[in-house]
């Protein structure tokens, strides 16, 4: 059974909470008596390196790998499961020690993850779950979705029609939808009149939100499952001549912060994540597993917090 553990959103507290005594390159003996290999090489696979969220995650893992003295390689999955399958096979051929994976498809990546484990690679899922991974670190995405939709509902006065820009079939997106559903269940006067999959991207969200607004021109709000989706929805609303729709997202990205800093923007709130911390914590967990130690918790949840135009001045943002 997996145990969930919540980390404070600072690197220091995260590492302390995990008690990562294994963060060295020393070879130790595990319970079976076999010597574990050193962590000399680390790979990171993400859905889309063009997304600033994953660029921040890349920064976190790179810094942690350099602190270990390990070589580091990051790969862009380009939102394509087949690409990620091929990348895992390439990492297997390279014989890397640790693979941190942000899966395009949490279930579909399972066989490739198993191949990596069979080849002796330690695999930890980051930001989204991945079938057969040995551990997972992610934002508390149920909380993130709930906070974003609660903010939206409050700002539209607790009643009205809304649209949802959904995303790819990953655990993080599914959990955000679950959290939003919890907020909606507590507010029966709010009804969802349209839901479409924006593939987590701004351009796709722009197109489908334009179509949904044509069909439902009187909506009061839009929830985007991530900030690129919410930003695309914001542009669609602007192009449709709207000015009073409330739009919320999830991420706390630099682009969202910039958009929300305008008092006239319809983008009103985002549930913040800490991608840098997610990446560095995932590597810390992998090092501990590689050393033969048992994790206190094999699923770690990092809390989210809501950011609005009124709280931007105290929001630290991504690094």
Which residues does each predicted region cover?
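A residue-level marker of the well-folded mature domains of exported/periplasmic proteins
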Residues: 2-9, 22-319
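Repetitive helical segments and hydrophobic/amphipathic motifs
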Residues: 11-14
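Bacterial Sec-type N-terminal signal peptides, specifically the leucine/valine-rich hydrophobic h-region
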Residues: 17-20
């Amino acid at each position: 059974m997996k145990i969930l553990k919540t980390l404070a959103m600072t690197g220091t507290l995260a590492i302390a909470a995990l008690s990562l005594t294994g963060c060295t390159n020393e070879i130790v003996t595990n319970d079976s008596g076999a010597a574990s290999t050193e962590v000399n090489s680390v790979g990171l696979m993400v859905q889309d390196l063009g997304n600033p969220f994953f660029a921040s995650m890349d920064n976190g893992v790179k810094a942690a790998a350099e602190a270990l003295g390990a070589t580091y390689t990051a790969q862009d999955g380009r939102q394509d499961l087949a690409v990620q399958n091929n990348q895992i096979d390439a990492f297997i051929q390279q014989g890397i020690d640790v693979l941190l994976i942000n899966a395009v498809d949490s279930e579909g990546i399972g066989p490739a993850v198993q191949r990596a484990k069979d080849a002796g690679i330690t695999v930890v899922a980051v930001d989204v779950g991945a079938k057969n991974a040995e551990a997972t670190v992610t934002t508390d995405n149920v909380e993130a979705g709930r906070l974003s939709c609660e903010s939206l509902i409050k700002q539209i006065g607790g009643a009205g029609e809304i649209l949802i820009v959904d995303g790819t079939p990953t655990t993080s997106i599914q959990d955000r939808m679950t959290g939003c559903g919890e907020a909606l269940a507590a507010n029966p006067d709010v009804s969802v009149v349209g839901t479409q999959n924006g593939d987590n991207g701004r351009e796709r969200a722009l197109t489908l939100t334009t179509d949904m607004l044509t069909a439902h021109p009187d909506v009061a709000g839009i929830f985007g499952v991530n900030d690129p989706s919410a930003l695309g929805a914001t542009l669609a609303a602007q192009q449709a001549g709207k000015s009073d729709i409330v739009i919320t997202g999830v991420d706390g990205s630099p682009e969202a912060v910039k958009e929300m800093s305008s008092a006239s923007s319809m983008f009103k709130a985002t549930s913040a994540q800490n991608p840098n911390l997610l990446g560095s914590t995932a590597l810390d967990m992998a090092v501990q597993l590689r050393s033969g130690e048992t994790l206190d918790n094999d699923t770690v949840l990092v809390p989210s917090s809501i950011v609005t135009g009124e709280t931007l001045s105290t929001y630290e943002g991504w690094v």
